[in-house]
């Protein structure tokens, strides 16, 4: 007889399908700093990220005890407050302050293709959540470079304000801005805090962003750094603050997106301010970044899959289940995930494109 073309073997077929992977938590803070450390251990590479996670590795920034450069105190103040990884990129001090600033901004070596200064932070193997360069970010030119880089890697940026009066600081704040330029993720700090230096045997003033970076790293990415008590023993410029008075200098600075250090009933000097230079809550920026980073990582494995209805439904359910864990631990008050009702179309699917809406508040 001829072959039966529709014949099927009367047996058993076992198909095993793994359930979608759990997406996990949002992750912790990781800091990236650029600055100088002229007495750093020769084994630490220059213009390359070096990971510091303890006072032992921090000591390599200055084995001589002279505490020279901008990175020594900045990293020390962070580690005093919270134990998080701090990646530092050490640049050489130039012949002039302007040369040093250029080294901090960095770029790409035209001969070797090596990334220098700020650009070197792009090769950090962990996801940076906070970046800065205490002592160098008090001008619009440098602030713009850090804002742009922060936008690209989805990290918040802590900037030095001008060493100026409140009125002049407000004028400077009006020069900065533009959410599409990355300034919505920039926290600008007004006055310089003083901390004790063993080398100087007295208090020394640090750049405004130094202690603010520590305050931002101390809390979760979706929490406000405002009202955090710092280790400041004094400030370069006293800012008038009264929680009941809306006419104070402090209130004026905050209304223009500038944070500052002032004495409060909590004792000592606290960081006051919780908005970026554009007025957006810096904690909300942190939440957006954290969720975005998690979705990018979780979506990597799904990029090669066919866009079938069951696949898309499964991915939507997976993200929605994960979002509900954020609701359960009170990271967000609520949220839902669904396919965009208008942007998704047959032509988009044919092109491998689909849109998922993550609605949270």
Residue ranges and their predicted role:
Residues 2-21, 25-56, 104-301, 336, ...:
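A glycine- and small-residue-enriched flexible loop/hinge signal that marks low-structured segments
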Residues 290-343:
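Extended, compositionally biased non-globular segments
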Residues 65, 277, 281, 305, ...:
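Hydrophobic alpha-helical scaffolding
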Residues 84-114:
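Well-ordered mid-protein domain cores that form the structural environment of catalytic cofactors
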Residues 343-361:
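C-terminal edge-of-domain segments
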Residues 75-79, 120-122, 146-150, 319-327:
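Hydrophobic, Leu/Ile/Phe/Ala-enriched alpha-helical segments that form helix-helix packing faces
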Residues 45-93:
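N-terminal assembly/attachment segments of tailed bacteriophage virion structural proteins
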């Amino acid at each position: 007889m001829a072959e039966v073309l529709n014949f099927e073997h009367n047996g058993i077929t076992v198909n095993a399908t793994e359930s979608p992977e759990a997406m996990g938590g949002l992750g912790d803070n990781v800091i990236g700093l650029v600055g100088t450390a002229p007495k750093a251990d020769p084994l630490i590479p220059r213009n390359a990220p070096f990971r510091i996670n303890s006072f032992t590795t921090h000591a390599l920034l200055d084995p001589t005890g002279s505490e020279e450069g901008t990175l020594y105190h900045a990293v020390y103040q962070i580690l005093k407050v919270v134990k998080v990884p701090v990646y530092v990129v050490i640049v050489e001090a130039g012949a002039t302050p302007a040369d040093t600033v250029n080294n901090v901004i960095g770029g790409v070596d035209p001969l070797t293709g090596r990334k220098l200064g700020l650009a070197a932070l792009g090769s950090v193997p962990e996801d940076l959540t906070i970046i800065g360069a205490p002592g160098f970010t008090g001008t619009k030119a440098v602030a713009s470079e850090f804002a742009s880089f922060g936008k690209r890697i989805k990290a918040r940026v802590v900037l030095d304000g001008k060493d100026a009066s409140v009125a002049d600081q407000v004028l400077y704040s009006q020069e900065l801005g533009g959410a599409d330029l990355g300034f919505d993720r920039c926290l600008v700090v007004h006055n310089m805090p003083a901390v004790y230096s063993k080398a100087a045997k007295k208090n020394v003033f640090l750049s405004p962003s130094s202690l603010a970076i520590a305050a931002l790293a101390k809390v979760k990415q979706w929490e406000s750094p405002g009202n955090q008590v710092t280790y400041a023993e004094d400030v370069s410029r006293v800012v008038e603050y009264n929680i009941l008075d809306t006419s104070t200098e402090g209130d004026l600075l905050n209304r223009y997106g500038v944070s500052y250090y002032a004495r409060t009933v909590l004792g000592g000097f606290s960081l006051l301010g919780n908005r970026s230079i554009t007025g957006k809550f810096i904690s909300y920026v942190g939440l957006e970044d954290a969720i975005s980073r998690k979705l990018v990582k979780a979506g990597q494995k799904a990029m090669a899959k066919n866009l079938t209805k069951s696949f898309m439904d499964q991915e939507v359910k997976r993200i929605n289940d994960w979002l509900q864990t954020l609701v359960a631990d009170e990271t967000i008050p609520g949220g839902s995930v669904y396919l965009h009702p208008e942007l998704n179309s047959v032509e988009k699917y044919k092109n491998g494109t689909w849109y998922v809406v993550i609605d949270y508040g």
